[in-house]
């Protein structure tokens, strides 16, 4: 199996993705902060809704720890904007519509909801420290599995 780009203690691959306002958001612009990348398969799908709302409800903790949360999916900026509005998501949702970032972080899932050939982001969490190094990586065995939110906050605390 080939080495993937996103191993622990390696430099996180930089990226530039559009947020819900179609503004460019670069990972490198958060240098010095802890960054939580929350990959999710799709807006308006049950577990994704739960995951993003759980992260939303934890934002005060993340803010207190000088951490930024970035949600990443292959959805369009417009779908992400509606998703953010419906659930009052208070962090950037980024559109990886060409799937480059999901591939760079080895977060591609094939066949969501039985759609053969449909590639989306798998559910996963990457935590990057202020130096831009990957310090935590969790990937769902299948998109129906949620991350351990308290473990994520504990890891962010340990880096702050």
Feature names for model-found ranges:
Residues 4-160:
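Chalcogenol-based redox active-site neighborhoods
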């Amino acid at each position: 199996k080939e080495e993937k780009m996103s191993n622990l203690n390696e430099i996180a691959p930089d990226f530039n993705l559009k947020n819900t306002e179609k503004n460019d958001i670069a990972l490198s612009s958060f240098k010095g902060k802890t960054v939580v990348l929350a990959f999710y398969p799709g807006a308006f799908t049950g577990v994704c809704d739960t995951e993003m709302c759980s992260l939303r409800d934890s934002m005060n903790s993340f803010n207190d720890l000088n951490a930024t949360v970035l949600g990443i999916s292959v959805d369009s900026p417009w779908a992400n904007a509606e998703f953010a509005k419906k659930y009052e998501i208070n962090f950037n949702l980024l559109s990886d519509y060409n799937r480059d970032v999901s591939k760079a972080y080895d977060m591609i899932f094939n066949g969501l909801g039985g759609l053969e050939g449909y590639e989306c982001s798998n559910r996963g969490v990457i935590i990057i420290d202020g130096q831009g190094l990957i310090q935590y990586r969790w990937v769902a065995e299948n998109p129906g599995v949620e991350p351990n939110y308290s473990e994520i906050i504990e890891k962010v605390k340990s880096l702050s």
